[in-house]
Swiss-Prot record:
It comes from the Eukaryota. SUPFAM superfamilies: Single hybrid motif. CDD domains: GCS_H. The lineage of its organism: Eukaryota, Viridiplantae, Streptophyta, Embryophyta, Tracheophyta. InterPro entries: 2-oxoA_DH_lipoyl-BS, Biotin_lipoyl, GCV_H, GCV_H/Fam206, GCV_H_sub, Single_hybrid_motif. Highly expressed in leaves, lower expression in green veins, petioles, and stems, and detected in roots. Induction: Up-regulated by light. Residues 56-138 form the Lipoyl-binding domain. This is Glycine cleavage system H protein 1, mitochondrial. S-nitrosylated and/or glutathionylated at unknown positions in response to nitric oxide. Residues 1-34 form a transit peptide. The modification Phosphoserine is found at S140. GO terms for cellular component: cytosol; endoplasmic reticulum; glycine cleavage complex; mitochondrion; nucleus; thylakoid.
């Protein structure tokens, strides 16, 4: 952890950043805080991600968000078959640093909740885009997905937000 913090502060001091060229076909890029941003996902400015496949949208918090939260120790999630509304809270993440609300980037009906997070909340830290997903939603307004940021926009957003702090 100390090495990670040192690397992050050094990169910030040197204003390092890297991006992946399209010719490498890598599915992710790194912002200057070394957080992973995946291609093929949409991102909210509240640091949630959405993976839309067919009629289902999977939602979780970004690597950037979990980096800032630190070690996640508890997750509060809603029940299946309830509704979420865009930009409204659907749960909370408690870390060793703080408790943060999770805002839904889209509206819809929750069709599945990641029950693994109850027993293993650290999955959000170790695998925010795979095992650490939070809910699966049937979107009620697919057009809401278009208002979210793509990977490049989200990376720039995070860099600007970090520079302001």
């Amino acid at each position: 952890m100390a090495l990670r913090m040192w690397a992050s502060s050094t990169a910030n001091a040197l204003k390092l950043s890297s991006s992946v060229s399209k010719s490498h076909l890598s599915p992710f890029s790194f912002s200057r805080c070394f957080s992973t941003v995946l291609e093929g996902l949409k991102y909210a400015n509240s640091h949630e991600w959405v993976k839309h496949e067919g009629s289902v949208a999977t939602i979780g918090i970004t690597a950037h968000a979990q980096d800032h939260l630190g070690e996640v120790v508890f997750v509060e999630l809603p029940e299946d078959n309830t509704s979420v509304s865009k930009e409204k809270s659907f749960g909370a993440v408690e870390s060793v640093k703080a408790t943060s609300e999770i805002l839904s980037p889209i509206s819809g009906e929750i069709i599945e909740v990641n029950k693994k997070l109850t027993e293993s909340p650290g999955l959000i830290n170790s695998s925010p885009y795979e095992d650490g997903w939070m809910i699966k939603v049937k979107p009620s307004s697919p057009a809401e997905l278009e208002s979210l940021m793509g990977p490049k926009e989200y990376t720039k957003f995070c860099e600007e937000e970090d520079a302001a702090h």
